[in-house]
């Protein structure tokens, strides 16, 4: 018990100790000293994520970031639809489903294309180098979905020359298994990272099992000290169950969810200017049985259909940041997003077996440009102004 308490104490100290020259990329499109930004940013680094040994980044963020709260319902997993957990709120903004709080991966928005809310089980620790949480509005750079704040997952990189492989395994109560294997390579300008995981639990209640498996891969190449290209892909699948209330349990409330994302970016970094152009594509397939209860007062019978949906989100982003004179930084950029999907009830039994009941089929487009101006007045005062149209 003493060892566990000491580990938690050390973990908290590491996460909350910021070095004087720590740089972040959230709240700004270029690496910037955190002291020069007009908003509060918390950083949870890779060491803290590894010490916590959580398959999802959300439990770690809840422990480490002031004002951030997430709902949970069991040993592992959050699920989707009715009875799901994973709702996030930051300084009172958010909730379930999460709105006003934007989740990013390397600056790209991550949410379900149909419902517009994040999928908590998709944000796995295996891909994260660090997580930057901006507490406050950031709509100039990221749009109206970031009114309450931003959670930006910065993906892992291979920093050290050579080949390294890590394997983590854990087993505990309720037949709970956590596993992760990662291989990292860096040779000259070439870098690669491949990681896979398998996690499962029976849960502490009947019909509360959870199973998740997936993988993450990232390749990069530095053409010169000033230009580089990188691409990555992440796919995860999870099976979750909703047990219902203890006094009125649910039967067959099962979910089978697949989420994926991929991106490609070309970056430039010079002494006085830096920028990037990137493309990303996110997708998801949901197969959900709403289940039923055995209480006759509920008048809730087994459903002859399953909710079946496919959603996606595609985007192209460009920005360039320049230092015009001492203490100045001017950033301009354009974002284009296309998102949507289709949903239906698919009958799997009964008289309508094989039929499909249309629910929605839609696609939306969004384009915006922005300019951000920042000027250091002194070592303790910075002027920041921006506009997004």
Locations of the language-model features?
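Short, acidic, small-residue-rich periplasmic hinge/interaction motif at the N-terminus
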Residues: 7-50, 58, 269
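Non-catalytic regulatory/gating segments with a bias toward low-complexity or hydrophobic composition
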Residues: 41, 49, 61-62, 131-133, ...
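Extracytoplasmic beta-strand/coil segments of soluble accessory domains associated
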Residues: 59-108
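Residues on the lipid-exposed face of transmembrane beta-strands in outer-membrane beta-barrel proteins
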Residues: 92, 181-185, 217-221, 264-268, ...
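Short acidic/polar hinge/loop motifs at secondary-structure boundaries
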Residues: 108-135
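Short strand-turn segments of transmembrane beta-barrel domains in outer membranes
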Residues: 138, 150, 154-185, 196, ...
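Surface-exposed extracellular loop regions of Gram-negative outer-membrane beta-barrel proteins
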Residues: 184-200, 228, 234-236, 275-302, ...
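Flexible loop and strand-edge segments within Gram-negative outer membrane beta-barrel domains
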Residues: 201-208, 212, 226-313
């Amino acid at each position: 018990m003493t060892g566990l308490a000491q580990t938690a104490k050390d973990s908290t100290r590491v996460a909350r100790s910021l070095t004087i020259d720590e740089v972040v990329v959230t709240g700004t499109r270029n690496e910037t000293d955190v002291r020069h930004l007009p908003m509060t940013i918390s950083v949870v680094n890779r060491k803290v994520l590894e010490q916590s040994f959580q398959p999802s980044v959300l439990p770690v963020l809840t422990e480490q970031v002031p004002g951030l709260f997430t709902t949970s319902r069991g040993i592992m997993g959050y699920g989707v639809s009715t009875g799901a957990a994973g709702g996030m709120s930051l300084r009172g903004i958010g909730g379930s489903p999460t709105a006003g709080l934007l989740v990013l991966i390397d600056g790209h928005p991550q949410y379900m294309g149909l419902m517009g809310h994040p999928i908590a089980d998709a944000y796995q620790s295996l891909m994260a180098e660090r997580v930057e949480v901006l507490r406050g509005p950031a709509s100039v750079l990221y749009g109206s979905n970031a009114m309450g704040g931003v959670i930006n997952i910065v993906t892992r990189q291979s920093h050290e020359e050579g080949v390294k492989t890590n394997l983590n395994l854990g087993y505990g109560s309720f037949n709970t298994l956590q596993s992760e294997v990662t291989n990292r390579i860096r040779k000259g300008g070439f870098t690669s990272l491949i990681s896979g995981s398998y996690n499962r639990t029976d849960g502490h209640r009947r019909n509360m099992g959870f199973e998740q498996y997936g993988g993450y891969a990232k390749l990069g190449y530095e053409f010169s000290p000033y230009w580089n290209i990188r691409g990555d892909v992440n796919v995860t699948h999870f099976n979750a169950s909703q047990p219902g209330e203890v006094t009125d349990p649910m039967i067959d409330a099962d979910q089978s969810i697949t989420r994926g994302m991929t991106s490609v970016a070309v970056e430039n970094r010079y002494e006085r200017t830096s920028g990037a152009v990137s493309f990303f594509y996110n997708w998801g397939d949901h197969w959900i049985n709403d289940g039923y209860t055995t209480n006759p007062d509920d008048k809730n019978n087994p459903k002859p259909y399953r909710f079946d949906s496919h959603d996606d989100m595609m985007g192209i982003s460009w920005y360039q940041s320049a230092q015009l004179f001492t203490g100045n930084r001017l950033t301009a950029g354009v974002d284009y997003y296309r998102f949507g999907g289709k949903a239906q009830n698919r009958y799997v039994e009964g008289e309508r077996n094989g039929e499909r009941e249309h629910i929605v089929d839609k696609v939306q487009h969004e384009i915006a440009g922005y300019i951000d101006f920042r000027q250091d007045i002194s070592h303790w005062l910075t002027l920041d102004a921006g506009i997004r149209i």
